[in-house]
Amino acid sequence: MNMANLKAVIPVAGLGMHMLPATKAIPKEMLPIVDKPMIQYIVDEIVAAGIKEIVLVTHSSKNAVENHFDTSYELEALLEQRVKRQLLAEVQAICPPGVTIMNVRQAQPLGLGHSILCARPVVGDNPFVVVLPDIILDGGTADPLRYNLAAMIARFNETGRSQVLAKRMPGDLSEYSVIQTKEPMVAEGQVARIVEFIEKPDEPQTLDSDLMAVGRYVLSADIWAELERTEPGAWGRIQLTDAIAELAKKQSVDAMLMTGESYDCGKKMGYMQAFVTYGMRNLKEGAKFRESIKKLLA
């Protein structure tokens, strides 16, 4: 399947429990990292990888996410009137020309796997991409036009095999999706076949692996049947991880070692790391911000 025909699914129906109380009234995907909400970084990455159709799986509490990608005629008219052309261009670039963003609702919180199934009427029985909205890949450490999601799509087009992005995570893996591969992976961008994939394992120390999934998946159409058959797993939810694990028993599924850095912005530490990193790079305020950080650390 040609890259341009792949749709990307972003599940944004989660309640953001790890970021309370900030997420009590604000969707976690709308929390800002400097001057853009988290979800904007995700969409920018997807578009950079060549995808033109994006499906947001939302919840009734996530109207702000939908509104962010809608056109605000009043705001644009005001910026035009006040000759704020740079700001106007930035607002209009939120949803780039030629990119379509669609919304479907997940009525019940039945897990990530169920959230993906909610997108099936829009995606159809086709291959597709899944990108989790709270894990930001640092575009300053790996060009999104070439690496990670873009490379996964290229490999999928070449091999037809589903792809899962992985990173090394020494320490406790009990809160993550743990990957075990047939061969060790050392170099960034390296690929190996998945032999085991477990969501939040009870005893991660029994697994001979320090690899975790990084919220980027390119999935063949065969995953739909596995999702339909998947019973509730960890936390009583239908897990995408379980469906991919079953698929990997029947056909080759690849793990690709992530290039660059990532931040789990669904948790406070990752969010703070991302904010500081992007703040120091900000073209307008970055230099002053770096100086203020130096003073704090002195």
Curated annotation (Swiss-Prot):
Q: Name one GO biological process term.
A: UDP-alpha-D-glucose metabolic process
Q: Does the keyword Nucleotidyltransferase apply?
A: yes
GO terms for MF: enzyme regulator activity; UTP:glucose-1-phosphate uridylyltransferase activity
Keyword set, alphabetical order: Capsule biogenesis/degradation, Lipopolysaccharide biosynthesis, Nucleotidyltransferase, Transferase
Q: Cite the InterPro entries for this sequence.
A: GalF (IPR005774), GalU_uridylyltTrfase_bac/arc (IPR005771), NTP_transferase_dom (IPR005835), Nucleotide-diphossugar_trans (IPR029044)
NCBIfam families, per database record: galF, PRK10122.1
* Protein's name according to its UniProt entry: UTP--glucose-1-phosphate uridylyltransferase
Q: Which organism is it from?
A: Klebsiella pneumoniae
